[in-house]
Swiss-Prot record:
Catalyzes the GTP-dependent ribosomal translocation step during translation elongation. During this step, the ribosome changes from the pre-translocational (PRE) to the post-translocational (POST) state as the newly formed A-site-bound peptidyl-tRNA and P-site-bound deacylated tRNA move to the P and E sites, respectively. Catalyzes the coordinated movement of the two tRNA molecules, the mRNA and conformational changes in the ribosome. This is Elongation factor G. Keywords: Cytoplasm, Elongation factor, GTP-binding, Nucleotide-binding, Protein biosynthesis. It comes from Dehalococcoides mccartyi (strain ATCC BAA-2266 / KCTC 15142 / 195) (Dehalococcoides ethenogenes (strain 195)). It is found in: Cytoplasm. GTP binds at residues 18-25, 82-86, 136-139. SUPFAM superfamilies: EF-G C-terminal domain-like, P-loop containing nucleoside triphosphate hydrolases, Ribosomal protein S5 domain 2-like, Translation proteins.
Length: 693
């Protein structure tokens, strides 16, 4: 067993999450500097950040992948993951939150709660991740602490527990006042020096007392010990208040709120203290649940070095220098470099080659890793995102990670045969890294088609393919991933008979189809009575039905949300076989769908545009011209936030058009909302175009 440098109670696995441009990466860079992981502060605008190490990240000034690093603060070991804020890379947030224990949510003090803020908040809530919030950019013109608190309460339905208030605002922002003891903090200074302190100005005392009283009242509502003291009129000491804040934070009953400006080095040291004081260690979270691989019986593992080894692989990276890196979170036990582990997801033994603690793109080789750690390994050849690694003598299968289906695709063609080989290898590695990136080969057109979550997502992946894998290829325009559905009940028979000398082919099945609720998926029911069709033939027919639905019946797009019930059929003792019934199933579903009033579904995107007020009319006009549906128009100081739904097919080129109508002064974010029925005339055009291919 290994000797721990830091007890489990002093380990923090945290993610820095937020909307794009809220200051996540800048905050993380300050954390690395203050914890002495770096000796100078990286800058996004200069492309010198440690965490944004990919060429595309430096060029675009955004975070694309989630990056892990280790840091140390006040006797605590922090595993910090900086995640992307752009919705096209939401998969990175999803997989990070699955393996983290706590989150630091960064908000732009000017913009407040933005579209992707809501998305990452929902993701964190789904995984039950305790959070603290950092209202950043308090030095910017238009920053408003109280308004942002109100937006967190109203839009995110969170119970705010402000533990600081800003002293000054915009160009007069001096720092923040801690409401527990009214100590004020200014510049963070160097790692060795304590943060600058100053006395609470007289002009802010009444406001600070009011905020503190509100904080105590909210804390009392959620914590019995504070409530008893509050009702008795007693003043609890700071340490007891901090213990109560930790309890309500871990229980997700309230969210501690802090403020500052990462760029100007104010507030990050206190934020680091808060991570240690209020966010959970691995022992504070419930035991990880799983099942026995063979029996499916429920099992669990506690965060302990003495329990059997269990871990979840959450990220694959193709490193150009060392090869295939697998990131995993250890939930129990420990593991050594060179040791054997069991992949219970795939039923295969694997060997841990080199064991690595990552610092963004730098690697630190280690001999062993303990429960609660996030590390990477070389040598795991058959382990993929969402796989469980464990001790073979005590196997467990942990819940995997669920990812959304891609909604956009484009064709890509290599220019030479050697490019074909490089492209195949590159696409395979990129698909291993990103579960929302899919690759399919179209047999009819001979084209390779790639699928992703949005234009930027595919743009970045194509850029990586061309630059990292040196592929010379032609790239088509983005296309919409439509879906098919039915709107009525129908019944049809599929009968496949072929006689050409010798043994013939015979398969016969009758099915009924009916629509299901949107998102319910495909269901097959066997309702054939009296053994009219043997079980193995019926399963072959079902395989034919399923494959036909996957390739499309109406317009060549996958058909979803349909219930298929097999009701009758017949077979021949000599001529029937599984292939004949597979053909019969395919024929039956095609005939049934034709009668069931098929429709086309199109992906609808939720779009949020932030524009100066003078361009609001132009932005709304452009939005309406795209078959958009306005949900809300929210005026803010200096800007207006327009939220609505727009079909993905109408959103291509929106970046350029929005820049044009607002002279580059508006921003927007867009995420997948749902699939909805496409208007008849437009659907007919898509169906006709599919028929001409």
């Amino acid at each position: 067993m290994s000797d721990r440098k830091y007890p489990l109670e002093r380990v923090r696995n945290i993610g820095i999450i937020a909307h794009i441009d809220a200051g996540k990466t800048t905050t993380t860079e300050r954390i690395l500097y203050l914890t002495k992981r770096t000796h100078k502060i990286g800058n996004i605008d200069d492309g010198t950040t440690v965490m944004d190490w990919m060429e595309q990240e430096k060029a675009r000034g955004i975070t694309i992948t989630s990056v892990a690093t280790s840091a140390y603060w006040n006797g605590h070991h922090l595993n910090v993951i900086d995640t992307p804020g752009h919705v096209d890379f939401t998969v990175e947030v999803e997989r990070s939150l699955r393996v983290l224990d706590g989150g630091v949510v960064v908000f732009d003090g000017v913009a407040g709660v933005e579209a992707q803020s809501e998305t990452v908040w929902r993701q964190a809530s789904r995984y039950g991740v305790p959070r603290i919030c950092f209202i950043n950019k308090m030095d910017r013109t238009g920053a408003n602490y109280e308004r942002t608190l109100g937006m967190i309460t109203q839009r995110l339905k969170a119970k705010c527990l402000p533990l600081q208030i800003p002293i000054g605002c915009a160009e007069t922002f001096r720092g923040s006042c801690d409401l527990l003891d009214f100590q004020c903090y200014g510049m963070d200074n160097s790692p060795e020096e304590p943060a600058e302190t100053f006395d609470l100005p007289d002009a802010d005392k009444e406001r600070a007392v009011k905020f503190r009283n509100t904080m105590i009242e909210r804390l009392a509502e959620e914590d019995d010990e504070v409530m008893e003291a509050y009702l008795a009129g007693e003043e609890l000491p700071v340490e007891k208040l901090k213990a109560a804040i930790r309890r309500v934070c871990l229980a997700n009953k309230a969210i501690p709120i802090f403020c500052g400006t990462s760029l100007r080095n104010k507030g990050v040291k206190r934020l680091l203290d808060a991570v240690c004081d209020y966010l959970p260690s691995p022992v504070d979270i419930p035991a990880i649940k799983g099942t026995a691989p063979k029996t499916g019986e429920p099992m669990e593992r506690h965060a302990s070095d003495t329990e059997p080894f269990s871990a979840l692989a959450f990220k694959i990276v193709s490193d150009p220098f060392v090869g295939r890196l697998v990131y995993f979170r250890i939930y129990s036990g420990n593991v050594s470099a060179g040791s054997g582990v069991y992949n219970s997801t795939r039923g295969e033994r694997e060997r841990i080659g080199r064991l690595i603690r990552m610092h963004a793109n730098d690697r630190e080789e280690i001999e062993y890793a303990d429960a609660g750690e996030i590390v990477a390994s070389l040598g795991l050849r058959n382990t993929f995102t969402g796989d469980t690694l464990c001790d073979q003598s005590a196997p467990i299968l942990l819940e995997s990670i669920k990812f959304p289906e891609p909604v956009i695709n484009l064709a890509i063609e290599p220019k030479t045969r050697s490019d074909q080989d490089k492209m195949t290898e590159g696409l395979q590695k990129l698909a291993e890294e990103d579960p929302t990136f899919k690759v399919k080969f179209d047999d009819e057109t001979g084209q390779t088609v790639i699928y992703g979550m949005g234009e930027l997502h595919l743009d970045v992946l194509v850029s990586r393919l061309l630059s990292e894998f040196k592929v010379n290829a032609s790239v088509g325009k983005p296309r919409v991933a439509y879906r098919e559905a039915i709107t009525a009940h129908a019944k049809a028979q599929g009968k496949f008979v072929r006689q050409s000398g010798g043994r013939g082919q015979y398969g016969d099945v009758t099915i009924e189809v009916e629509p299901r609720e949107r998102g319910a998926g495909y269901e097959f029911v066997d309702n054939v009575k009296g053994g009219a069709v043997p079980r193995n033939f019926l399963m072959a027919a079902e395989a034919g039905i399923r494959e036909t639905l996957e390739t499309g019946v109406y317009a060549g797009y996958p058909m979803v949300d349909v219930k298929v019930t097999a009701v009758d059929g017949s077979y021949h003792d000599v001529d029937s076989n599984e292939n004949a019934f597979k053909m019969a199933g395919s024929m039956a579903i095609k005939a049934a769908v034709a009668k069931a009033k098929p429709i086309l579904l199109e992906p609808i995107m939720k779009l949020e545009a932030v524009t100066p007020e003078e361009y609001m009319g132009d932005v709304i006009g452009d939005f309406n011209s795209r078959r958009g549906q306005i949900i809300s128009v929210e005026p803010n100081p200096e800007t207006t936030v327009i939220t609505g739904n727009v079909p993905l097919a109408e959103s291509f080129g929106y970046t350029t058009d929005l820049r044009s109508v607002t002279k580059g002064r508006a921003t927007f974010s867009m995420e997948f909302e749902s699939y909805r029925e496409m208007p008849g005339e437009l659907a007919n055009q898509v169906v006709e175009a599919a028929g001409k291919k």
